[in-house]
Amino acid sequence: VDLYKAKGQEAIGTRYQRSKFRRPDYLHYSATGKAILAHLPAERVEWILDEYGLVERTDATITDPDALFDELEQIREQGYSVNREEEIEGIRAVGAPILTPSGDVLGSVSISGPAHRMRTPEYEEEMVAAITDTANRIQVDINTESADDEFPGFES
């Protein structure tokens, strides 16, 4: 479920955005989905794969469960996910999880753009920094709100 979407000045066309709402989304080929999968228990990920499979959207889509589990491990280690034209050819994305203090995943955020702009290591590093910073800010806001609930006598 998308809670919020925004388009930048150089956003990909509205036809692409509308088409995303007309078809099922699978977690294994999007940056947001992979960021979520990486932080779910392995049994839950296996259930999702058994239930929905690894649908191939492009030649770059991961369709092998072992390859997906390897990538999910890498995502946990590095703290972000990358969609390398796995959902739509010509579009790449970088995502980051939003976690509770105990490490449970609440959701994720991502930024996407044309592959020709997002292929350079410098640009990917810039996007990783932006998205992980955004995820961290959201986590702090959520965790601060939770802490306020634990101490109702204090007002912020």
Describe each region flagged by the PLM.
Residues 98-101:
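Sensor-regulatory modules in signal-transduction proteins
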